[in-house]
Amino acid sequence: MSALDNRLFAKMNGIGNEIVVVDLRDQPAPVTPADARAVAAHVPYDQLMLLQPARLSGTEAFVRIYNNDGSESGACGNGMRCVARQMFSGSEKNGLTFETRAGLLNCWRGPADGLYTVDMGEPKFGWQDIPLAEEFRDTRMIELQIGPIDAPVLHTPSVVSMGNPHAIFWVDDVNAYDLGRFGPLLENHPIFPERANITLAHIVDRQHITMRTWERGAGLTKACGSAACSTAVAAARLKRTDRTVEMTLPGGQLTIEWRESDNHVLMTGGAAFEFEGRFDPALFSGALDPTGA
């Protein structure tokens, strides 16, 4: 028996990042990695956002985040905007606080209808915090490349943690590389003991960046909020952009502000509802064929 048996779920997306949200605040029983993989086989998603009973006073819920391969993630900005949209529906509150593995996240209604802002917290730059498998005194750009030594295909990424590890490769054209091929190689590179999210980014000007991401545990994605935050922060660290930038992702636009007053990163963007459903218990007992045959 699974904690997800017969549970109502909402299928949503955050500018193309496929999200499933399930409210389990009345259900303390754990959801397993096998459960998360079973859901992905029938309701394809990038992240599964599970609202579990609040652990801390003043928070709405503890949000557990699964990738579609059954691994857990500490943060998912696009998913948190979807959670915020669901929780703000029918509520008069203007702000909500959630607990995640990465810490507390605050969410607000955005500057316009359909937009939501998430405070993603402070970025981390120390090699142990990202983490990396070996010491780098300066993580603004590290020695890492893929391809021939004298003509690398991708090289010298910036590395940042926004609750999960990110590597950003600076390129002239984000569509000129086979990220579906290089992404898994770099995600699983030995330098990243917890694997990493891999982003290709092009700085258009001081207020605009375009990017594509191979998401750890999920693969190619139309949008990754924590990657957008990491990319914006990494560019600002290199003095190549301002601290507020517009990010263009395959799925749409995000506004990222790296706030100077407290070092927090704010992400603003949309969240769309697609449909609701209930999980068939047979999904978790193995009675349903994942192929649909």
From Swiss-Prot:
Family: Belongs to the diaminopimelate epimerase family.
InterPro entries: DAP_epimerase_AS (IPR018510), DAP_epimerase_DapF (IPR001653)
Top enzyme class: isomerase
Reactions accelerated catalytically: (2S,6S)-2,6-diaminopimelate = meso-2,6-diaminopimelate
Keywords assigned: Amino-acid biosynthesis, Cytoplasm, Isomerase, Lysine biosynthesis
Pfam families according to UniProt: DAP_epimerase
Example GO molecular function: diaminopimelate epimerase activity
Active site location: 76, 224
Subunit structure: Homodimer.
Key word Amino-acid biosynthesis present: yes
Chain positions recorded as substrate binding sites: 17, 47, 67, 77-78, 164, 197, 215-216, 225-226
Enzyme Commission number(s): 5.1.1.7
Pathways involved: Amino-acid biosynthesis; L-lysine biosynthesis via DAP pathway; DL-2,6-diaminopimelate from LL-2,6-diaminopimelate: step 1/1
Subcellular location field: Cytoplasm
Presence of the UniProt keyword Amino-acid biosynthesis in the record: yes
Site label Could be important to modulate the pK values of the two catalytic cysteine residues, positions: 166, 215
Identification of the protein by name: Diaminopimelate epimerase
Function: Catalyzes the stereoinversion of LL-2,6-diaminopimelate (L,L-DAP) to meso-diaminopimelate (meso-DAP), a precursor of L-lysine and an essential component of the bacterial peptidoglycan.
Superkingdom of the organism of origin: Bacteria
GO CC terms, sorted: cytosol
GO biological processes: lysine biosynthetic process via diaminopimelate
